[in-house]
């Protein structure tokens, strides 16, 4: 965002002009959008533990075989690894959301994740379901406008959903 500000100022300075109302309006819109992004990410970060825990509970309620003896989340160590992985995906989704770009999610989280899960014998379809459950919880939080500036956030909510969809597809 600072690059955009610097660019507009440099252009005006090169022309020896003050910033125009149009330029100021565009920068103001960019700040407003940035504030909405921050609100969405703050809601996710503030509720990350609940998002992960509740999503895992819902997954295990639907797929109890995962937590039964022989299941991929059976034993405390495996359960902790499952929750850790869910938290990592959620964290990188929040990074992508604040950046407005999926490259950090792709490069640092998703690339090679399917292969890793296959090598470990982790069912990708179950991971995908867990990611979708985190999406549902995160989108619900993003849609809750309590205590946040008013305005249309539908594009940001759709963008947020797309990052979760990207993660869910990458593991199956």
From Swiss-Prot:
GO terms under cellular component: chloroplast thylakoid membrane; phycobilisome
Extent of the signal sequence: none
UniProt binding sites for (2R,3E)-phycocyanobilin 2: 153
UniProt entry tagged with the keyword Signal: no
Record's subcellular location: Plastid, Chloroplast thylakoid membrane
Membrane topology, from the record: Peripheral membrane protein
Modification comment: Contains two covalently linked bilin chromophores.
Alphabetized InterPro entries for the sequence: Globin-like_sf, Phycobilisome_asu/bsu, Phycobilisome_asu/bsu_sf, Phycocyanin_b
Chief place where the protein resides: plastid
Subunit structure: Heterodimer of an alpha and a beta subunit, which further assembles into trimers and the trimers into hexamers. The basic functional unit of phycobiliproteins is a ring-shaped hexamer formed from two back-to-back trimers contacting via the alpha chain subunits. The trimers are composed of alpha/beta subunit heterodimers arranged around a three-fold axis of symmetry. The phycoerythrins also contain a gamma subunit which is located in the center of the hexamer.
Record-linked PANTHER family: C-PHYCOCYANIN BETA SUBUNIT, PHYCOBILISOME 32.1 KDA LINKER POLYPEPTIDE, PHYCOCYANIN-ASSOCIATED, ROD 2-RELATED
Family from the record: Belongs to the phycobiliprotein family.
Described purpose of this protein according to its UniProt entry: Light-harvesting photosynthetic bile pigment-protein from the phycobiliprotein complex (phycobilisome, PBS). Phycocyanin is the major phycobiliprotein in the PBS rod.
Protein name: C-phycocyanin beta chain
Taxonomic source organism: Porphyra purpurea
Gene, per the UniProt record: cpcB
